[in-house]
Amino acid sequence: MEKVYEELDEVKAVNEKLRIDYRNKTELLENLKKVQNEQLIEIREARLVNEKHGFEIEEKSREIAELKRANEELQRCLREKDSVVKRVNDVNDKLRANGEDKYREFEEEKRNMMSGLDEASEKNIDLEQKNNVYRAEIEGLKGLLAVAETKRIEAEKTVKGMKEMRGRDDVVVKMEEEKSQVEEKLKWKKEQFKHLEEAYEKLKNLFKDSKKEWEEEKSKLLDEIYSLQTKLDSVTRISEDLQKKLQMCNGALTQEETRRKHLEIQVSEFKAKYEDAFAECQDARTQLDDLAGKRDWEVAELRQTLSMKDAYFKEMKYENGKLEQENRELLGSLKELQEATIQGSGNSALSKLKNKFRNLENIHKNCSANLRSKEAEWSSQVEKMVEEINDYKLQLQSKEAALKEVELELENCRSSTAKMRLQYEEISIMFLVLSRTVSEAQSRLANAKDKQIKDEKREGNCYSLLMEQLDQKNAALAKAQMEIKEERESVACLLKRIEMLDLFENQNIQMQKEVERFKEMVEESSRFQTQMQEKMKEAENDYEEKLLQVCDALDNTNIDLVAEREKVVSLTRQIESLGTVKEKNLVMEKETQEYKEMLEESEKCRVLLEEQISQLESDSNENIRELCSKVDIAYAKLAEEVEKTASLVRKSESIDLNEEHRQRELDHYKEMLEESTKTQLLLQEKVVDVENDSKRKLADVSEALEIANSELSDKTSEVFQIEFQLWVWKSIAKRLKAELEQNQNLRKRVEASLLEQVGVGEAIKQEKNELVHKLKVISHARSSDSEKKESLMRDKDEMLESLQREVELLEQDSLRRELEDVVLAHMIGERELQNEREICALQQKDQDLCEVKHELEGSLKSVSLLLQQKQNEVNMLRKTWEKLTARQILTAVETESKKMMIIELEGEISSLSQKLETSNESVSCFRQEATKSRAELETKQTELKEVTTQMQEKLRTSEAEKTELVKEVASLSTEKRNLLSFISEMEDGMLKLYDGDTKLMKTLERVTQCCDGFGKENNNGETIGSPRLAMKHEEDVVTEDRSPFRPLNH
């Protein structure tokens, strides 16, 4: 007993130790719970950090909205600049008004010059009056000469009288002397008169020459004035255009400078944002490093705890072994005691030990049941954990793929940022070059303006010189030499002026070339700016999308971390419940190993995340570069789109034509349907008429049969002939039945073939739909793959898809119509074949009846009356056959003996009634078919209405699209026209300048020719002088020649 008590004490001591171990394990579990709580706190802090990142992203989105607002403000600034441009246009209008005032002043000067020309013409009129006076004087001299001649005649008469009266020689001598003197005077006066006439003719010729020269000079001067005015107008217009262009260039340069400044600001903002994002990434990396360090520390603590648990587990195993051995020893000792001491004083102690033993057995039994239940629970939990682990592995793989994509995008973003920096540097260089070129252009324009002012002053001086020249020419019509000198001076001035104008035109041409070059530079810069804006927008969108993706990835990782930590919490709880169970310890070991692997994988994922972030930065740069290249490709595609718009316009026109053709076809089909409905109505009316006629004819046939029965009772000798006729009719009926069966078989075959064709058509439609679906799937896949590349082509792809759908619908409609046409054609063909066959059968019957008639007429003359009656009956039946359209078979007239003929006729009447029933059934079938056809027609009409409405809607949409395309084409055509008008204006200006140059050259050639002519005349002795000097010279010559008459004049 003492040994049992000692053993019990030892068991108690072992139990106390186990309790102490349990307490220690509970403390360790509480520590693990605290660690888990700390981890949860860290996770919450990480969530807060993520929320902060989300707020920062929202702030960035707000900043983007502010940038958009800034963009709108820039657009407002552009509008204000447009208003400024309008004001500048108003100023230009004012300048034009000033130019018009100057033009009016020039017109006033022109009028003054014309008044000077009028004064010169008045002087010419005075000279003409003087010439008339000289002519009157010459006529007076001629009268004096006539008077002198009369006096001479009278003197001669007196001399003759004196001679007659006086015969003195002295008087005769005197008279002769006087006569000789008078004759000499007369000769001298005649010579003088001749000289005067010659001088007068010379003066006339000189006056005419001077008048012609004056008119020529006047016309030349007027031409020069007009040419100079046109040149001035063209020069003023060119100068105004250049000023406008310069103002536009200055405005564009200011706009470009403002844009450049805004772009620099945006670049700086983007740099700051990039630096902030980079700093945030670095912070995230540091946080990840801190988290990794904490995880390493936690893993080390977990490993320590696991090692401690392993040691405790081994101790527990050892203690359990000891306890089992002790239990066995106790059981053996108890059995010995039960055998040894059945009776004695140890009964009470044995009863106590038995009770304790029983309690221990119950406890062991309960422990085994609990262990089995827990083993089942843990096996199910292990399976669930394995499934969850597989799921988490798949999630980790998907996240790794997503992280790789994010890394690629970051690399693209980095490459694109590098490209953007290079492009911004190129833009800055371009702006510097443009600023320098603009400054040079402004300096050149200032010099050109100074030259223009000088040229205007010179032109004013030239106008004053021209006025002086006109005054001098008007005052010096009698002084040709002075005019020649002045003309030479004017020629020299004109030559100088022409040289200056040539220089001015060359300068203008150079300035135009420079302006065009500046225009091209401005256009290129504007295009480049638009490209850069689009690229910046696309880069912003990509950056936002990538940030969203990164945020989503971070959220997913945080969720995964939370799930993992929750799993850790559940595992710690499970560890609490798995205190002393071996299987639970094994499961814990497996789970710890798995979690070690998970931690290692998480560390790998963290490393991969860091690598992916670096790759994403590089991908972002590459994406920006690719976007730049894509934008260039898009601008290249814009030209193709313009061509495509033209082709679409052409296609729209062709579609309009096709739609008109289809509308016509629809109208034609509608007419066909109306005609078919009308034909069906007519057929129904005919069927009703046929029924009525058949009833009437049946009544007539019954009456005729009664008459035939009454008449055939007396005539039995004709039975065999009538039996022959009946046999013929039976053969004909069999033939008709065979033909009907053939027709029905043919109809069934045709219907089967039509159904097969319909099935084939539906299969083709299904295949087409499947192909269309596949094409749509492929197009969607391609569009999803190339959304970034072909964002501009989506609208046109949708247009093409809608056009394809319309084409498919039209094809389906055409197939339906073709099938309907085929069905109608088959039905009509069947009816026509049936009609033809019935007609042929009736014709054959007619022929057979005619043959029978001839045979009966040849063989039986006595029965002619009956045959005639039966022929009439046969004719009536033939008419009924023609009207029933191959659905009714008439029976022939049967004649037998009285009883046999009556029986056969009753059988024929029954057969006729059955056939009438069949005909009624066929009529009812026809009616049903007619109703079905009506229903089908109504459905088809509804379908046609729906199709027409759809086509009208499509036509409306196509018309709207057509109007939009026409508007776009009109806008493009207007732009083209504006460009062509601008080019034509430039060409007109150049042509005007060229015409002015040619006119000036012509005037110079004329002036030089005139100068050469005047020089030659002066070199030839200055024969063309003033008329007065010539007269004086001639008078001196005459006086010198007539020197002997000087003493006689005294």
Swiss-Prot record:
InterPro entries assigned: At4g38062-like
Coiled coil: 1-420, 463-627, 692-981
Keyword Coiled coil: yes
UniProt keywords, alphabetically: Coiled coil
UniProt name for this protein: Uncharacterized protein At4g38062
Organism of provenance: Arabidopsis thaliana (Mouse-ear cress)
Species lineage: Eukaryota, Viridiplantae, Streptophyta, Embryophyta, Tracheophyta
